[in-house]
From Swiss-Prot:
<dbReference type="GO" id="GO:0003700">
    <property type="term" value="F:DNA-binding transcription factor activity"/>
</dbReference>
<dbReference type="GO" id="GO:0046209">
    <property type="term" value="P:nitric oxide metabolic process"/>
</dbReference>
<dbReference type="GO" id="GO:0045776">
    <property type="term" value="P:negative regulation of blood pressure"/>
</dbReference>
<dbReference type="GO" id="GO:0038023">
    <property type="term" value="F:signaling receptor activity"/>
</dbReference>
<dbReference type="InterPro" id="IPR050234">
    <property type="entry name" value="Nuclear_hormone_rcpt_NR1"/>
</dbReference>
<dbReference type="GO" id="GO:0006355">
    <property type="term" value="P:regulation of DNA-templated transcription"/>
</dbReference>
<dbReference type="GO" id="GO:0032099">
    <property type="term" value="P:negative regulation of appetite"/>
</dbReference>
<dbReference type="GO" id="GO:0007507">
    <property type="term" value="P:heart development"/>
</dbReference>
<dbReference type="GO" id="GO:0000978">
    <property type="term" value="F:RNA polymerase II cis-regulatory region sequence-specific DNA binding"/>
</dbReference>
<dbReference type="GO" id="GO:0042060">
    <property type="term" value="P:wound healing"/>
</dbReference>
<keyword id="KW-0010">Activator</keyword>
<dbReference type="GO" id="GO:1903038">
    <property type="term" value="P:negative regulation of leukocyte cell-cell adhesion"/>
</dbReference>
<dbReference type="InterPro" id="IPR001628">
    <property type="entry name" value="Znf_hrmn_rcpt"/>
</dbReference>
<feature type="DNA-binding region" description="Nuclear receptor">
    <location>
        <begin position="99"/>
        <end position="173"/>
    </location>
</feature>
<dbReference type="GO" id="GO:0043565">
    <property type="term" value="F:sequence-specific DNA binding"/>
</dbReference>
<dbReference type="GO" id="GO:0001666">
    <property type="term" value="P:response to hypoxia"/>
</dbReference>
<dbReference type="GO" id="GO:0000122">
    <property type="term" value="P:negative regulation of transcription by RNA polymerase II"/>
</dbReference>
Protein backbone atom coordinates (compact mmCIF):
# COMPACT_ATOMS: atom_id res chain seq x y z
CA UNK A 1 0.00 0.00 0.00
CA UNK A 2 1.24 3.52 -0.81
CA UNK A 3 1.82 5.80 2.13
CA UNK A 4 -0.47 8.65 1.16
CA UNK A 5 1.00 10.96 3.78
CA UNK A 6 4.41 10.91 2.11
CA UNK A 7 5.37 12.55 -1.17
CA UNK A 8 5.76 10.23 -4.11
CA UNK A 9 9.38 9.64 -5.02
CA UNK A 10 10.59 9.10 -8.56
CA UNK A 11 11.53 5.61 -9.66
CA UNK A 12 15.11 4.59 -9.12
CA UNK A 13 16.98 3.00 -12.01
CA UNK A 14 16.77 -0.80 -12.13
CA UNK A 15 19.39 -3.18 -13.30
CA UNK A 16 18.59 -5.52 -16.16
CA UNK A 17 18.62 -8.48 -13.77
CA UNK A 18 15.76 -6.96 -11.81
CA UNK A 19 13.55 -7.12 -14.87
CA UNK A 20 13.70 -10.89 -15.05
CA UNK A 21 11.33 -11.35 -12.12
CA UNK A 22 7.84 -12.51 -13.17
CA UNK A 23 6.39 -9.69 -11.07
CA UNK A 24 8.76 -6.99 -12.25
CA UNK A 25 6.64 -5.85 -15.20
CA UNK A 26 3.51 -5.45 -13.11
CA UNK A 27 5.49 -3.77 -10.29
CA UNK A 28 7.18 -1.33 -12.64
CA UNK A 29 3.92 -0.61 -14.40
CA UNK A 30 2.13 0.15 -11.13
CA UNK A 31 4.96 2.35 -9.85
CA UNK A 32 5.20 4.03 -13.22
CA UNK A 33 1.50 4.80 -13.08
CA UNK A 34 1.97 6.53 -9.71
CA UNK A 35 4.77 8.70 -11.02
CA UNK A 36 2.87 9.58 -14.20
CA UNK A 37 -0.21 10.57 -12.22
CA UNK A 38 1.91 12.63 -9.85
CA UNK A 39 3.57 14.48 -12.70
CA UNK A 40 0.28 15.00 -14.50
CA UNK A 41 -1.34 16.44 -11.41
CA UNK A 42 1.63 18.72 -10.94
CA UNK A 43 1.47 19.93 -14.52
CA UNK A 44 -2.28 20.55 -14.33
CA UNK A 45 -2.42 22.14 -10.90
CA UNK A 46 -5.23 24.41 -12.15
CA UNK A 47 -7.66 21.54 -11.50
CA UNK A 48 -8.67 20.86 -15.11
CA UNK A 49 -8.04 17.14 -14.66
CA UNK A 50 -11.21 15.25 -15.66
CA UNK A 51 -12.16 11.68 -14.84
CA UNK A 52 -14.47 11.65 -17.85
CA UNK A 53 -11.43 11.00 -20.04
CA UNK A 54 -11.11 7.53 -18.50
CA UNK A 55 -14.61 6.37 -19.36
CA UNK A 56 -15.01 3.98 -22.24
CA UNK A 57 -17.20 1.12 -23.39
CA UNK A 58 -15.85 -2.22 -22.24
CA UNK A 59 -15.06 -4.81 -24.87
CA UNK A 60 -13.76 -7.46 -22.53
CA UNK A 61 -15.77 -10.59 -21.69
CA UNK A 62 -18.31 -9.90 -19.04
CA UNK A 63 -18.54 -6.19 -19.65
CA UNK A 64 -21.59 -6.56 -21.87
CA UNK A 65 -20.76 -3.22 -23.44
CA UNK A 66 -21.52 -1.40 -20.21
CA UNK A 67 -19.83 1.84 -19.27
CA UNK A 68 -16.77 1.34 -17.09
CA UNK A 69 -14.99 4.14 -15.24
CA UNK A 70 -11.32 3.81 -14.26
CA UNK A 71 -11.00 5.96 -11.18
CA UNK A 72 -7.86 6.56 -9.22
CA UNK A 73 -7.75 4.19 -6.27
CA UNK A 74 -5.85 4.83 -3.00
CA UNK A 75 -3.20 2.41 -4.18
CA UNK A 76 -2.48 4.44 -7.29
CA UNK A 77 -3.03 8.07 -6.36
CA UNK A 78 -2.06 10.38 -3.48
CA UNK A 79 -5.08 10.96 -1.28
CA UNK A 80 -3.59 14.21 -0.04
CA UNK A 81 -4.32 15.82 -3.40
CA UNK A 82 -7.91 16.83 -3.97
CA UNK A 83 -9.21 17.55 -7.46
CA UNK A 84 -11.99 20.09 -7.72
CA UNK A 85 -15.05 18.95 -9.62
CA UNK A 86 -15.08 20.32 -13.13
CA UNK A 87 -18.24 20.06 -15.24
CA UNK A 88 -17.59 17.93 -18.28
CA UNK A 89 -18.80 18.84 -21.73
CA UNK A 90 -21.58 16.96 -23.47
CA UNK A 91 -19.25 15.11 -25.78
CA UNK A 92 -17.32 13.73 -22.81
CA UNK A 93 -20.34 12.27 -21.05
CA UNK A 94 -20.56 8.50 -20.47
CA UNK A 95 -23.23 8.21 -23.11
CA UNK A 96 -20.78 9.44 -25.74
CA UNK A 97 -17.81 7.38 -24.51
CA UNK A 98 -15.68 5.66 -27.12
CA UNK A 99 -14.85 2.00 -27.43
CA UNK A 100 -11.20 2.14 -28.50
CA UNK A 101 -8.67 -0.65 -28.85
CA UNK A 102 -4.98 -0.42 -28.06
CA UNK A 103 -3.11 0.31 -31.29
CA UNK A 104 -0.37 -2.12 -30.30
CA UNK A 105 -2.03 -5.28 -28.93
CA UNK A 106 -5.77 -4.78 -29.42
CA UNK A 107 -6.61 -4.76 -25.70
CA UNK A 108 -8.93 -2.01 -24.45
CA UNK A 109 -7.17 1.36 -24.53
CA UNK A 110 -7.04 3.23 -21.24
CA UNK A 111 -6.27 6.58 -22.81
CA UNK A 112 -4.14 8.60 -25.21
CA UNK A 113 -0.55 7.72 -24.28
CA UNK A 114 2.63 8.85 -26.03
CA UNK A 115 0.66 10.02 -29.05
CA UNK A 116 -1.55 6.94 -29.64
CA UNK A 117 -4.42 5.11 -27.99
CA UNK A 118 -2.82 2.42 -25.85
CA UNK A 119 -3.61 0.10 -22.97
CA UNK A 120 -1.89 0.33 -19.60
CA UNK A 121 0.33 -2.64 -20.39
CA UNK A 122 1.73 -1.26 -23.64
CA UNK A 123 2.04 2.24 -22.19
CA UNK A 124 4.13 0.89 -19.32
CA UNK A 125 6.19 -1.32 -21.63
CA UNK A 126 7.04 1.61 -23.91
CA UNK A 127 7.88 3.86 -20.95
CA UNK A 128 10.23 1.29 -19.37
CA UNK A 129 11.95 0.59 -22.68
CA UNK A 130 12.64 4.29 -23.28
CA UNK A 131 13.63 5.20 -19.71
CA UNK A 132 15.87 2.23 -19.10
CA UNK A 133 17.20 2.30 -22.67
CA UNK A 134 16.53 -1.40 -23.01
CA UNK A 135 17.79 -3.26 -26.08
CA UNK A 136 15.98 -6.44 -27.09
CA UNK A 137 17.30 -9.41 -29.04
CA UNK A 138 16.52 -8.89 -32.70
CA UNK A 139 13.65 -10.90 -34.15
CA UNK A 140 13.11 -11.34 -37.90
CA UNK A 141 9.75 -13.13 -37.63
CA UNK A 142 7.56 -10.01 -37.55
CA UNK A 143 5.52 -11.47 -34.68
CA UNK A 144 1.85 -10.53 -34.54
CA UNK A 145 1.30 -8.65 -31.29
CA UNK A 146 -1.96 -9.50 -29.53
CA UNK A 147 -3.25 -9.24 -25.99
CA UNK A 148 -2.66 -12.92 -25.29
CA UNK A 149 0.94 -13.02 -26.56
CA UNK A 150 2.22 -9.45 -26.23
CA UNK A 151 4.86 -10.40 -23.64
CA UNK A 152 6.45 -13.16 -25.75
CA UNK A 153 8.48 -11.04 -28.19
CA UNK A 154 9.61 -7.73 -26.73
CA UNK A 155 11.53 -6.73 -29.86
CA UNK A 156 8.47 -6.96 -32.12
CA UNK A 157 6.30 -5.35 -29.47
CA UNK A 158 8.57 -2.32 -29.23
CA UNK A 159 8.83 -2.15 -33.02
CA UNK A 160 5.02 -2.17 -33.18
CA UNK A 161 4.91 0.70 -30.67
CA UNK A 162 7.16 2.77 -32.90
CA UNK A 163 5.38 1.80 -36.12
CA UNK A 164 1.99 3.00 -34.85
CA UNK A 165 3.50 6.33 -33.84
CA UNK A 166 4.40 6.07 -30.16
CA UNK A 167 6.89 8.75 -29.18
CA UNK A 168 8.40 9.84 -25.87
CA UNK A 169 8.05 13.43 -27.03
CA UNK A 170 4.33 13.06 -27.76
CA UNK A 171 1.42 13.42 -25.32
CA UNK A 172 2.33 11.09 -22.47
CA UNK A 173 -0.75 10.95 -20.31
CA UNK A 174 -4.04 12.79 -20.22
CA UNK A 175 -6.90 14.04 -22.26
CA UNK A 176 -7.46 13.40 -25.91
CA UNK A 177 -7.56 16.61 -27.98
CA UNK A 178 -11.10 17.63 -28.94
CA UNK A 179 -10.26 17.59 -32.64
CA UNK A 180 -8.84 14.08 -32.31
CA UNK A 181 -11.90 12.90 -30.39
CA UNK A 182 -14.31 14.36 -32.98
CA UNK A 183 -12.35 12.81 -35.82
CA UNK A 184 -12.23 9.43 -34.08
CA UNK A 185 -15.96 9.48 -33.37
CA UNK A 186 -16.71 10.22 -37.01
CA UNK A 187 -14.43 7.37 -38.15
CA UNK A 188 -16.00 4.91 -35.71
CA UNK A 189 -19.55 5.85 -36.70
CA UNK A 190 -18.73 5.59 -40.40
CA UNK A 191 -17.01 2.23 -39.91
CA UNK A 192 -19.87 0.85 -37.80
CA UNK A 193 -22.43 2.04 -40.35
CA UNK A 194 -20.51 0.44 -43.23
CA UNK A 195 -20.06 -2.82 -41.33
CA UNK A 196 -23.74 -2.92 -40.41
CA UNK A 197 -24.80 -2.30 -44.00
CA UNK A 198 -22.41 -4.97 -45.24
CA UNK A 199 -23.55 -7.48 -42.61
CA UNK A 200 -27.21 -6.79 -43.33
CA UNK A 201 -26.66 -7.32 -47.05
CA UNK A 202 -24.85 -10.62 -46.43
CA UNK A 203 -27.57 -11.87 -44.09
CA UNK A 204 -30.34 -10.95 -46.51
CA UNK A 205 -28.45 -12.70 -49.29
CA UNK A 206 -28.12 -15.90 -47.22
CA UNK A 207 -31.81 -15.84 -46.26
CA UNK A 208 -32.78 -15.33 -49.89
CA UNK A 209 -30.62 -18.21 -51.12
CA UNK A 210 -32.06 -20.63 -48.56
CA UNK A 211 -35.63 -19.52 -49.29
CA UNK A 212 -35.13 -19.94 -53.04
CA UNK A 213 -33.63 -23.40 -52.52
CA UNK A 214 -36.64 -24.32 -50.38
CA UNK A 215 -39.15 -23.26 -53.02
CA UNK A 216 -37.15 -24.98 -55.76
CA UNK A 217 -36.65 -28.38 -54.13
CA UNK A 218 -40.01 -29.08 -52.45
CA UNK A 219 -43.13 -29.86 -54.46
CA UNK A 220 -45.42 -28.50 -51.76
CA UNK A 221 -44.96 -25.42 -49.60
CA UNK A 222 -47.11 -23.44 -47.23
CA UNK A 223 -48.28 -20.89 -49.80
CA UNK A 224 -49.62 -23.61 -52.11
CA UNK A 225 -51.10 -25.60 -49.24
CA UNK A 226 -52.94 -22.66 -47.67
CA UNK A 227 -54.52 -21.72 -51.01
CA UNK A 228 -55.85 -25.27 -51.41
CA UNK A 229 -57.02 -25.59 -47.80
CA UNK A 230 -58.79 -22.23 -48.05
CA UNK A 231 -60.65 -23.40 -51.17
CA UNK A 232 -59.21 -20.59 -53.29
CA UNK A 233 -57.58 -22.75 -55.95
CA UNK A 234 -58.81 -22.54 -59.53
CA UNK A 235 -58.33 -26.29 -59.95
CA UNK A 236 -60.65 -28.99 -58.69
CA UNK A 237 -60.85 -29.21 -54.89
CA UNK A 238 -58.92 -32.08 -53.29
CA UNK A 239 -60.55 -35.49 -53.10
CA UNK A 240 -61.61 -36.12 -49.48
CA UNK A 241 -60.76 -39.45 -47.85
CA UNK A 242 -62.99 -39.98 -44.82
CA UNK A 243 -63.72 -43.74 -44.79
CA UNK A 244 -62.54 -47.07 -46.21
CA UNK A 245 -64.57 -46.64 -49.39
CA UNK A 246 -63.06 -43.28 -50.27
CA UNK A 247 -59.63 -44.64 -49.31
CA UNK A 248 -60.01 -47.42 -51.88
CA UNK A 249 -61.11 -44.88 -54.50
CA UNK A 250 -58.06 -42.73 -53.80
CA UNK A 251 -55.75 -45.73 -54.06
CA UNK A 252 -56.95 -46.32 -57.62
CA UNK A 253 -56.19 -42.75 -58.68
CA UNK A 254 -54.22 -40.48 -56.36
CA UNK A 255 -51.73 -42.98 -54.92
CA UNK A 256 -52.00 -45.78 -57.46
CA UNK A 257 -48.22 -46.02 -57.91
CA UNK A 258 -47.65 -46.28 -54.17
CA UNK A 259 -49.91 -49.30 -53.70
CA UNK A 260 -48.82 -51.13 -56.85
CA UNK A 261 -45.78 -52.74 -55.27
CA UNK A 262 -47.27 -55.88 -53.77
CA UNK A 263 -49.31 -54.25 -51.01
CA UNK A 264 -52.58 -53.76 -52.89
CA UNK A 265 -54.07 -56.96 -51.41
CA UNK A 266 -53.13 -56.22 -47.81
CA UNK A 267 -55.38 -54.61 -45.23
CA UNK A 268 -56.09 -50.87 -45.34
CA UNK A 269 -53.88 -49.96 -42.35
CA UNK A 270 -50.85 -51.68 -43.89
CA UNK A 271 -51.49 -49.95 -47.23
CA UNK A 272 -51.75 -46.62 -45.42
CA UNK A 273 -48.47 -47.27 -43.57
CA UNK A 274 -46.81 -48.13 -46.88
CA UNK A 275 -48.06 -44.87 -48.46
CA UNK A 276 -46.69 -42.90 -45.51
CA UNK A 277 -43.28 -44.45 -46.09
CA UNK A 278 -43.36 -43.64 -49.82
CA UNK A 279 -44.11 -39.98 -49.06
CA UNK A 280 -41.32 -39.90 -46.46
CA UNK A 281 -38.77 -41.33 -48.91
CA UNK A 282 -39.72 -38.73 -51.50
CA UNK A 283 -39.35 -35.94 -48.95
CA UNK A 284 -35.95 -37.28 -47.84
CA UNK A 285 -34.79 -36.98 -51.46
CA UNK A 286 -36.05 -33.40 -51.61
CA UNK A 287 -34.40 -32.57 -48.28
CA UNK A 288 -31.08 -33.93 -49.52
CA UNK A 289 -31.13 -31.58 -52.50
CA UNK A 290 -32.19 -28.69 -50.28
CA UNK A 291 -29.35 -29.40 -47.84
CA UNK A 292 -26.79 -29.31 -50.66
CA UNK A 293 -27.99 -25.79 -51.48
CA UNK A 294 -27.33 -24.53 -47.92
CA UNK A 295 -24.10 -22.46 -48.13
CA UNK A 296 -21.30 -24.44 -46.48
CA UNK A 297 -23.08 -27.81 -46.31
CA UNK A 298 -21.44 -29.20 -49.45
CA UNK A 299 -17.99 -28.43 -47.98
CA UNK A 300 -18.56 -30.94 -45.18
CA UNK A 301 -17.09 -34.41 -45.10
CA UNK A 302 -19.51 -36.82 -46.79
CA UNK A 303 -19.91 -38.81 -43.57
CA UNK A 304 -20.98 -35.66 -41.72
CA UNK A 305 -23.47 -34.82 -44.46
CA UNK A 306 -25.03 -38.28 -44.13
CA UNK A 307 -25.12 -38.02 -40.32
CA UNK A 308 -26.82 -34.61 -40.37
CA UNK A 309 -29.47 -35.86 -42.79
CA UNK A 310 -29.97 -39.13 -40.90
CA UNK A 311 -30.80 -37.33 -37.66
CA UNK A 312 -32.44 -34.25 -39.14
CA UNK A 313 -34.77 -35.46 -41.88
CA UNK A 314 -37.70 -36.50 -39.70
CA UNK A 315 -37.58 -33.30 -37.66
CA UNK A 316 -37.66 -31.42 -40.96
CA UNK A 317 -40.43 -33.64 -42.38
CA UNK A 318 -42.73 -33.07 -39.40
CA UNK A 319 -42.01 -29.33 -39.58
CA UNK A 320 -43.03 -29.12 -43.23
CA UNK A 321 -45.94 -31.51 -42.71
CA UNK A 322 -47.51 -28.87 -40.48
CA UNK A 323 -48.00 -26.65 -43.54
CA UNK A 324 -50.25 -29.33 -45.06
CA UNK A 325 -52.40 -29.71 -41.96
CA UNK A 326 -55.33 -28.01 -40.33
CA UNK A 327 -57.43 -29.13 -37.39
CA UNK A 328 -59.60 -31.35 -39.63
CA UNK A 329 -57.04 -33.23 -41.69
CA UNK A 330 -54.09 -33.02 -44.07
CA UNK A 331 -53.34 -32.69 -47.75
CA UNK A 332 -51.79 -35.64 -49.60
CA UNK A 333 -50.73 -36.38 -53.18
CA UNK A 334 -49.43 -32.86 -53.90
CA UNK A 335 -52.66 -31.29 -52.70
CA UNK A 336 -54.94 -33.47 -54.84
CA UNK A 337 -56.26 -35.35 -51.83
CA UNK A 338 -57.33 -34.55 -48.26
CA UNK A 339 -57.48 -37.24 -45.57
CA UNK A 340 -59.52 -36.43 -42.48
CA UNK A 341 -58.06 -36.48 -38.99
CA UNK A 342 -61.05 -38.42 -37.70
CA UNK A 343 -60.52 -41.21 -40.22
CA UNK A 344 -56.86 -41.55 -39.21
CA UNK A 345 -57.83 -41.71 -35.52
CA UNK A 346 -60.24 -44.57 -36.28
CA UNK A 347 -57.61 -46.86 -37.80
CA UNK A 348 -56.78 -49.87 -35.67
CA UNK A 349 -53.96 -49.91 -33.15
CA UNK A 350 -51.07 -49.14 -33.45
CA UNK A 351 -51.64 -47.38 -36.81
CA UNK A 352 -54.11 -44.91 -35.28
CA UNK A 353 -51.24 -43.50 -33.19
CA UNK A 354 -49.07 -42.53 -36.16
CA UNK A 355 -50.56 -39.18 -37.17
CA UNK A 356 -52.34 -37.80 -34.09
CA UNK A 357 -49.15 -36.53 -32.35
CA UNK A 358 -48.19 -34.81 -35.61
CA UNK A 359 -51.54 -33.00 -35.68
CA UNK A 360 -51.03 -31.84 -32.09
CA UNK A 361 -47.61 -30.44 -32.97
CA UNK A 362 -48.87 -28.87 -36.20
CA UNK A 363 -51.65 -26.93 -34.46
CA UNK A 364 -49.14 -25.32 -32.10
CA UNK A 365 -46.57 -24.75 -34.82
CA UNK A 366 -49.09 -23.20 -37.22
CA UNK A 367 -50.19 -20.83 -34.45
CA UNK A 368 -46.82 -19.09 -34.88
CA UNK A 369 -48.01 -17.98 -38.35
CA UNK A 370 -44.69 -18.53 -40.10
CA UNK A 371 -44.33 -18.20 -43.85
CA UNK A 372 -42.12 -20.20 -46.22
CA UNK A 373 -39.16 -17.84 -45.81
CA UNK A 374 -39.24 -18.41 -42.03
CA UNK A 375 -39.74 -22.17 -42.36
CA UNK A 376 -36.89 -22.52 -44.87
CA UNK A 377 -34.40 -21.02 -42.40
CA UNK A 378 -35.83 -23.09 -39.55
CA UNK A 379 -35.44 -26.31 -41.56
CA UNK A 380 -31.88 -25.33 -42.54
CA UNK A 381 -31.03 -24.77 -38.86
CA UNK A 382 -32.47 -28.20 -38.02
CA UNK A 383 -30.34 -29.93 -40.64
CA UNK A 384 -27.10 -28.15 -39.70
CA UNK A 385 -27.15 -29.14 -36.04
CA UNK A 386 -23.76 -29.63 -34.41
CA UNK A 387 -24.85 -31.94 -31.57
CA UNK A 388 -25.76 -34.97 -33.68
CA UNK A 389 -23.99 -38.20 -32.62
CA UNK A 390 -20.94 -39.28 -34.60
CA UNK A 391 -20.06 -35.98 -36.27
CA UNK A 392 -16.42 -35.40 -37.21
CA UNK A 393 -16.12 -31.65 -37.84
CA UNK A 394 -18.30 -30.44 -34.98
CA UNK A 395 -16.78 -26.96 -34.77
CA UNK A 396 -17.45 -26.14 -38.42
CA UNK A 397 -21.02 -27.42 -38.22
CA UNK A 398 -21.72 -25.45 -35.04
CA UNK A 399 -20.51 -22.27 -36.74
CA UNK A 400 -22.66 -23.12 -39.76
CA UNK A 401 -25.75 -23.52 -37.60
CA UNK A 402 -24.88 -20.45 -35.54
CA UNK A 403 -24.84 -18.36 -38.71
CA UNK A 404 -28.17 -19.73 -39.90
CA UNK A 405 -29.81 -19.25 -36.49
CA UNK A 406 -28.52 -15.67 -36.41
CA UNK A 407 -30.04 -15.02 -39.84
CA UNK A 408 -33.28 -16.65 -38.67
CA UNK A 409 -33.44 -14.39 -35.62
CA UNK A 410 -32.92 -11.21 -37.64
CA UNK A 411 -35.32 -12.40 -40.33
CA UNK A 412 -38.05 -13.03 -37.75
CA UNK A 413 -37.50 -9.59 -36.25
CA UNK A 414 -37.97 -8.07 -39.70
CA UNK A 415 -40.80 -10.33 -40.83
CA UNK A 416 -42.72 -10.39 -37.52
CA UNK A 417 -41.82 -7.12 -35.74
CA UNK A 418 -44.81 -7.30 -33.40
CA UNK A 419 -43.97 -10.76 -32.00
CA UNK A 420 -40.90 -10.20 -29.84
CA UNK A 421 -41.00 -13.74 -28.41
CA UNK A 422 -41.28 -15.58 -31.73
CA UNK A 423 -37.60 -16.54 -31.89
CA UNK A 424 -37.46 -18.24 -28.45
CA UNK A 425 -40.79 -19.93 -29.22
CA UNK A 426 -39.29 -21.34 -32.40
CA UNK A 427 -36.20 -22.59 -30.58
CA UNK A 428 -38.51 -24.45 -28.20
CA UNK A 429 -40.10 -26.13 -31.22
CA UNK A 430 -36.71 -27.67 -32.00
CA UNK A 431 -36.84 -29.39 -28.63
CA UNK A 432 -40.45 -30.49 -29.20
CA UNK A 433 -39.52 -31.94 -32.59
CA UNK A 434 -36.82 -34.14 -31.10
CA UNK A 435 -39.30 -35.61 -28.66
CA UNK A 436 -41.81 -36.10 -31.48
CA UNK A 437 -39.27 -37.93 -33.64
CA UNK A 438 -38.17 -40.11 -30.71
CA UNK A 439 -41.75 -41.20 -30.08
CA UNK A 440 -42.31 -41.79 -33.81
CA UNK A 441 -39.18 -43.96 -34.08
CA UNK A 442 -40.32 -46.02 -31.10
CA UNK A 443 -43.77 -46.51 -32.66
CA UNK A 444 -42.23 -47.62 -35.96
CA UNK A 445 -40.18 -50.23 -34.09
CA UNK A 446 -43.38 -51.50 -32.45
CA UNK A 447 -45.09 -51.78 -35.84
CA UNK A 448 -42.06 -53.51 -37.30
CA UNK A 449 -42.11 -56.13 -34.53
CA UNK A 450 -45.87 -56.72 -34.30
CA UNK A 451 -47.01 -56.31 -37.92
CA UNK A 452 -45.43 -58.91 -40.17
CA UNK A 453 -46.90 -57.35 -43.33
CA UNK A 454 -45.67 -53.84 -42.54
CA UNK A 455 -42.17 -53.91 -44.00
CA UNK A 456 -39.91 -50.86 -43.80
CA UNK A 457 -38.43 -49.17 -46.86
CA UNK A 458 -34.63 -49.84 -47.04
CA UNK A 459 -33.77 -46.12 -46.92
CA UNK A 460 -35.93 -45.59 -43.83
CA UNK A 461 -34.45 -48.69 -42.20
CA UNK A 462 -31.02 -47.09 -42.57
CA UNK A 463 -32.27 -43.82 -41.06
CA UNK A 464 -33.89 -45.56 -38.08
CA UNK A 465 -30.88 -47.80 -37.41
CA UNK A 466 -29.16 -46.76 -34.16
CA UNK A 467 -31.08 -43.49 -34.20
CA UNK A 468 -32.45 -43.64 -30.66
Amino acid sequence: MVDTESPICPLSPLEADDLESPLSEEFLQEMGNIQEISQSLGEESSGSFSFADYQYLGSCPGSEGSVITDTLSPASSPSSVSCPAVPTSTDESPGNALNIECRICGDKASGYHYGVHACEGCKGFFRRTIRLKLAYDKCDRSCKIQKKNRNKCQYCRFHKCLSVGMSHNAIRFGRMPRSEKAKLKAEILTCEHDLKDSETADLKSLAKRIHEAYLKNFNMNKVKARVILAGKTSNNPPFVIHDMETLCMAEKTLVAKMVANGVENKEAEVRFFHCCQCMSVETVTELTEFAKAIPGFANLDLNDQVTLLKYGVYEAIFTMLSSLMNKDGMLIAYGNGFITREFLKNLRKPFCDIMEPKFDFAMKFNALELDDSDISLFVAAIICCGDRPGLLNIGYIEKLQEGIVHVLKLHLQSNHPDDTFLFPKLLQKMVDLRQLVTEHAQLVQVIKKTESDAALHPLLQEIYRDMY
